[in-house]
Amino acid sequence: MSESLSVLLTNDDGIDAVGIQALYQAFDDIAEVTVVAPTDDQSAVGRQLSSDVTIHEHDWGYGIDGTPADCVVAGVEALCPDVDLVIAGCNKGANIGAYVLGRSGTVSAAVESTFFDVPAMAVSMYIPGGGDTPWHKQATEVSAFADASRAATYLARHAFDAGVFEQADYLNINAPVAANEPATLEVTRPSRVYDMTAEHDGNGTVTLHDRVWERMRTDDIPDPSGTDRRAVVDGHISVSPLAAPHTTEHHEALDALASTYLDSI
């Protein structure tokens, strides 16, 4: 499959970000790659969609004045149809935990792809932050994304023949910053740990704070083995096989309420 693999590559950090450059260089050796990515930073926009977007020619494909979801729709339907795989990333910053997935532009691009029945991978890299070097000055070179690139290309080459996408709609991959030795790969599930807080200052402002990230830096997390966050904090590559959202199951209690609705009016 890898010899004829056709890939649409997008992200939410913008087409000039180092993370998408790292994946483009890695996949250019094994696939036919077309980049369709936002022209500017679209982090945390979720699946926000536009009605019209302006496209710009780029050496790697196209820049889009829009969101990651816009890029997938425009790419799959108009700019590079018949792709085998959509890859979003590599995001500079992890996308882990069940509550994060719907916010992430990176993951949302992968989700958008699944509604076209095109398998996808969302690829992100965990940067602990803290310390003497500001977060935005970390992982500024392609080499920092080596683990993420290795994992993504490995899975792209082998997942189809292994039947992975017969059971999963998309893969959410989170890797550490590359070290001297390659990181190991673990199959995980999204963590359910949630630690958002809000403080009202009494003067018209409520400050929202996600405490999970600072707790991760000190390993002060209750996430059990087998979760994406635990794997990443322990220095492993996390791969979560996921289905597109909004699935449903038979619900007897709701059936009972529905059956008596008209009687209540």
Curated annotation (Swiss-Prot):
Catalytic activity, as annotated: a ribonucleoside 5'-phosphate + H2O = a ribonucleoside + phosphate
Co-factor binding comment: Binds 1 divalent metal cation per subunit.
Entry GO terms, CC: cytoplasm
EC number of the protein: 3.1.3.5
The name this protein goes by in its record: 5'-nucleotidase SurE
Localisation per UniProt entry: Cytoplasm
Signal peptide per UniProt: none
The protein's role, per its UniProt record: Nucleotidase that shows phosphatase activity on nucleoside 5'-monophosphates.
Residue stretches in coiled coil: none
Record keyword Cell membrane present: no
Major location category of this protein: cytoplasm
EC class (word): hydrolase
The entry's keywords: Cytoplasm, Hydrolase, Metal-binding, Nucleotide-binding
InterPro entries for the chain: SurE, SurE-like_Pase/nucleotidase, SurE-like_sf
Superkingdom to which the source organism belongs: Archaea
Co-factor(s): a divalent metal cation
Family label: Belongs to the SurE nucleotidase family.
Positions with a binding annotation for a divalent metal cation: D12, D13, S43, N91
Molecular function GO labels: 5'-nucleotidase activity; metal ion binding; nucleotide binding
